[in-house]
Amino acid sequence: MNRYRLTVEFDGRNFMGWQRQKHGATIQGSIEEAGASIAGQPTPVQAAGRTDAGVHGLAMTAHIDVARDFTPFRLMEALNARLKPRPIAILSCEQVDPEWHARFSCIGRRYLYRIINRRPPLTLEAGRAWHVIKPLDAETMDIAAKRLIGLHDFTTFRSVHCQSKSPVKTLDHLDVRRIGDQIEITAAARSFLHHQVRSMVGCLVLVGQGQWTADDMTTALEARNRAALGFNAPPDGLYFTQAIY
């Protein structure tokens, strides 16, 4: 069995998320179907992260197992041909050791959350960013974001459906910056809880709108209670940007 490392870009708007589902289109399912049509047998795919419905990928790392021999370039070209017209692209492909695993070998993950902060409706960015009309103070948001960095119990920022054994995670990086009418929030950690990034972003927007202070963010964190959460940001603005090995 040959294992290939893939870098995958995708527009998550019309998918049920990364993970294969019994009903509905998914990124994993689409790539496995494309691989099976090339190899003539199942081609299991695993990824560094499992994104939700509507979440996008700029550079998701995955691996695919193929029994037949392909050069990486030929496999990449064949997968891309069969993935059309779905908004999924294999950006790179390389053969790796069969023991290497896209998920379990990963030591860090990075996400980007994009907010368009303006009154006019979104056109080109619709479904690819969160449209927030009320003005946001990015500097205040960044100050509050720093309250979350470090080793914490993130129960408040964890989905009730999260399957992680422990709510304790180390958040290595959380940064907020404004570029024109766009606000970019970047987050990095070894791993994240289900909905953790979107939950943190939702609370940061409350801070940016003046409804919360940085102290309120700390209070929510220390509550270790989902009821203390402001709200979840929508999936539209979330992008998986990098897996670190």
UniProtKB/Swiss-Prot annotation:
Binding locations of substrate: 111
Signal peptide: none
Keyword Transmembrane applies: no
Annotated GO biological process: tRNA pseudouridine synthesis
Gene3D superfamilies (UniProt xref): Pseudouridine synthase I, catalytic domain, C-terminal subdomain (3.30.70.660), Pseudouridine synthase I, catalytic domain, N-terminal subdomain (3.30.70.580)
Cross-referenced CDD domains: PseudoU_synth_EcTruA (cd02570)
Uppermost EC category: isomerase
EC number annotated for this UniProt entry: 5.4.99.12
Residue positions of the active site: 52 (nucleophile)
Keyword annotations from UniProtKB, A to Z: Isomerase, tRNA processing
Catalysed reactions, as listed in the record: uridine(38/39/40) in tRNA = pseudouridine(38/39/40) in tRNA
Pfam families the UniProt entry points to: PseudoU_synth_1
Gene Ontology terms, MF aspect: RNA binding; tRNA pseudouridine(38-40) synthase activity
InterPro entries listed in its UniProt record: PsdUridine_synth_cat_dom_sf, PsdUridine_synth_TruA, PsdUridine_synth_TruA_a/b_dom, PsdUridine_synth_TruA_C, TruA/RsuA/RluB/E/F_N
Known partners and oligomeric status: Homodimer.
Biological role: Formation of pseudouridine at positions 38, 39 and 40 in the anticodon stem and loop of transfer RNAs.
Cited NCBIfam families: hisT_truA
Family: Belongs to the tRNA pseudouridine synthase TruA family.
Name this protein carries in UniProt: tRNA pseudouridine synthase A
